[in-house]
Amino acid sequence: MNRSNLVKRAIVRAAVLASFLVAAVPNAYAQEKVRPEVGKPLQAAQDLMRTNKFKDALAKVREADAVPAKTPYETYMIERMRASAATGAREGDTAIKAYEAVIASGKAPAADQLKIIEALATSYYNARDYPSAIKWGARYFKEGGSGGQIRTLMIQSQFQSGDFAASAKESLADIEADERAGRAPAEDKLLLLANSYLRQKNNSGYIATIEKLLNYYPKKSLWADIISRLQKKPGFSDRLALDVFRLQLATGNLTSTNDYMEMAQLALQAGNAAEGKKVIEEGFNNGALGKGAEADRHKRLRDLANKRIAEAEKTAAAELAEANAAKDGNALVRLGYSQATSGQAAKGVETIEAGIKKGGLKRPEDARLYLGLAYIHSGQKAKGISILKSIRGYEGGVGDIANLWVLFSQKSA
């Protein structure tokens, strides 16, 4: 949760707690006596707060405080009312001092104590005094509190005070507890964990958390982030450039003219003419291609794709025979994925499986990646996801690519 959102909630929460203190005042009057010269201005302050005239209410509290020779109980009631009025008037320092005085008096009923401590912790957070917010939040739990809002406030205070290791540890504990209970962790919790890892330069922790966010709350911007980081991962292979583009295209993150051109060219070079044509047509349809000084170049690439498709149709039988005659299954895998992306998904699955069975593959995990995607293209999503999940080889980044396709496929229609 970013600080501005939590502050808004904290301000509202502080106001609710302050109104509780006002509502509880009549009951407190019944316990011990308050002299009229103290009680009347306090009653007036209470009435003013009910109409949101908090600064006027503070003036009445000061009037009560000016009465000489106050009893400890009268002082307690004055500070209690001052805390409520100051909270409503957004006078944080005054509210904090008053709340601390109320707690220190020892006169607050046991039933009220936790709410007062919660209000104090919240007030410290609103004042950006994060160490004090953590201190009073800890006391809240020590005295038996169990409110999730205070725990969130404490973790956010750890983050804001620069203790990113602590905010990561506590956020992760909450998230894991939610998952064990079968609940989706709150998006705010996951974002806080991600930011805690990011501040520690813990890239693996950050990526793992973004993957959780994609699982529970998929967003285009998150996909853009994780795909970008994937390419920067040490050891990530350039051979997977086309696979990265495929993820960008699927998640709505292929946007620039250069990206459309490069992806189309890579697809054509890989022998996937139909895939290249699809990319080119999408680029023309959304305005990324066909405009500007390079418009003629874009049209020539489209013509080349159409030519390659026509050639592939003529040579399909011969190419399949040649792949079947090869000593290894590499050509069958390449041809099978080309079939899968050209509207022949079922045939593509069959061809890739034949290539895997033949063996001698240069990169077996790449072959399983394309088999999983081919199954998904064929409408057998569950089978495809199962295969993608089985990819354990991370040579060059293929396992990372497979994992992202699992996340995407699980959330797509």
Model features per residue range: what roles?
Residues 61-62, 93-103, 130-141, 165-177, ...:
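Alpha-helical repeat scaffolds
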Residues 89-154:
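Surface-exposed, polar helix/loop patches in the mature regions of secreted/periplasmic/lumenal proteins
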Residues 48, 82, 86, 124, ...:
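Residue at a conserved register position within TPR or TPR-like alpha-solenoid repeats
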Residues 2, 6, 11, 15-16, ...:
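N-terminal leader/linker segments that initiate helical-solenoid repeat arrays
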Residues 327-413:
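C-terminal soluble interaction/assembly domains
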Residues 51, 89, 127, 161, ...:
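Structural motif corresponding to the intra-repeat A-B loop/turn of tetratricopeptide repeats
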Residues 34-43, 72-79, 109-119, 144-153, ...:
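Generic helix N-cap/helix-start motif at coil->alpha-helix transitions
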Residues 31-34, 65-71, 101-110, 138-146, ...:
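Solenoid-like repeat scaffolds
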